[in-house]
Amino acid sequence: MNKEKKLSIMGVGSYNLDTIVKREYPEGFVPGKRNKFVEKVMIEEIGSNPGNVMCILGWFGWDSYPIALFDDSEEGMKMTSDMKRFGCNTRFVSNTPEGGTNLLKVTHALDDYGKPVRKFSKRHAPGSGFPRDKAFTVRGKDATLPKFIAGLDFFPDVYFYESTTAAWRDLGKWMRSKGVMVYYEVQRMYMKEFPKYLKCMKESDIVKFSDEAVEDLGFVDELKDKLVIQTLGAKGVRFNLRGAGWVTLPPVVNDNVVDTEGCGDWTTASFINALGKRGAVKFADLTFEIVSDCLMEAQEYASRNASFLGTKGIITANT
């Protein structure tokens, strides 16, 4: 827990209400055959990268302030309730008819050969006007982002976001101009929108992505004033601090893997928490030793969580 000093984080992105389903085969499973199955709902809670990161940091003891514009459906209300349950401050979370709520169904099943697989199905909540995420507006006399900024009465230690949405990028740029450390995470890079991603990365202090999300790293040469982190799955993690070249760290091995979903989110949240414990919440504080130590600690949490079903198994097991 982060008990020495009450640090704060503000974060935003694409939120989901995750429904984790496990398929069971009551008559057994025969590879290559059409096997009868039943689906059992195991977990239903807020998820996605920003949802998990903000909830995990709330659990770690941070003042965690997610920004979210949900609808007022049952699902949207549950997402707000879940944020509170995991220790978040929902001051900047709203549930209105104009909001939006996304649902993600994650099904744990067996493929035709009997190998465990995950299947994903995303949709929006019944009654939501649009499946898209809602954000502040940035233009026009009624733009809501300037009003949000004008109403802020504090600066968080860290601002986290993971989309290319203009409002969240502009908020990050403004936060950084005020001395807040900005952490940007790339979930999936679509090359036709690469200029948007690059703009977000250039206006951040820390940039993180996985080897699955980003393959071509030629752009890293343009980020020589950043900390760039790339997770490598079972191969560990590597980082490039201020353009000094890549440093690769070994993985933390887990021989009892149940579910790897959420490991990247634990890496992010645990890394931020580890920086906080070391008093390194300003980019100028970052050294190779601090980054290495914090990333190894982050990998330990991510590896532990892989022994549980769901993205926040460690928390559930400790409550």
Q: Which residues make up each language-model segment?
A:
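Ribokinase/PfkB-type carbohydrate-kinase core domain
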Residues: 2-20, 82-95, 108-250, 279-284, ...
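Short alpha-helical functional segments enriched in proximate histidine and acidic residues
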Residues: 86, 274, 301, 305
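Short alpha-helix plus adjacent loop in nuclease-associated cores
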Residues: 101-108
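Glycine-rich phosphate/adenosyl-contacting loop at the front of the ribokinase-like
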Residues: 1-67, 74-78, 85-88
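Short, small-residue alpha-helix embedded
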Residues: 54-56, 62, 258-286, 290
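Short pre-catalytic strand/loop immediately N-terminal to key active-site residues, enriched for Gly-Thr
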Residues: 36-45, 250-262
